[in-house]
Amino acid sequence: MILTPGAYLKCRRTACGKSHQDVVDVIETDPAMSQAERVEWLKMIEADMVAVRWSTIVALRQQFPFDLAVLERLSLIQDGTDLPEPRLCRICASSDTGPLGLAVPAWGWDAPDLCISCACAS
């Protein structure tokens, strides 16, 4: 099953070991929101319940690595565009951007859907 854009962001955040609180503690909102409200907002983003502004994507990417091209492709697929699914690790959702933001080389895959970082950790 293909990931939604929000599920992709959630997977990348958790692959980096960051909690909702870790991320929202350093993201400012306008208008200002409490930490609890920001946590709920991030959960809604990850559940694809709210639209995400470009400034939010930039702020999230400063907190954990993810591939903008993958996020865009998943968004287009979700909107009905007929595109092939991006190659993603089934555990950390790495593509060209690995679990720690490092490039995954062509030989960096243990299986078609499993990067060697996650294969070694299993």
What are the roles of these predicted feature ranges?
Residues A69-G98, G108:
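Short, charged recognition helix plus adjacent turn
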Residues I27-V52:
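Recognition helix of helix-turn-helix/homeodomain-like DNA-binding domains
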Residues L100-S122:
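Cysteine-rich micro-motifs
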Residues V50-E72:
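DNA major-groove recognition helix of helix-turn-helix/homeodomain DNA-binding modules
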Residues D25, M44, R73-L76:
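Phosphate-coordinating loops and pocket residues in cytosolic domains that bind phosphorylated ligands
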Residues M49, I91, D96, A119-S122:
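Cys/His-rich microdomains that often coordinate metals
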Residues D22, W41, V70:
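Residues in the helix-turn-helix
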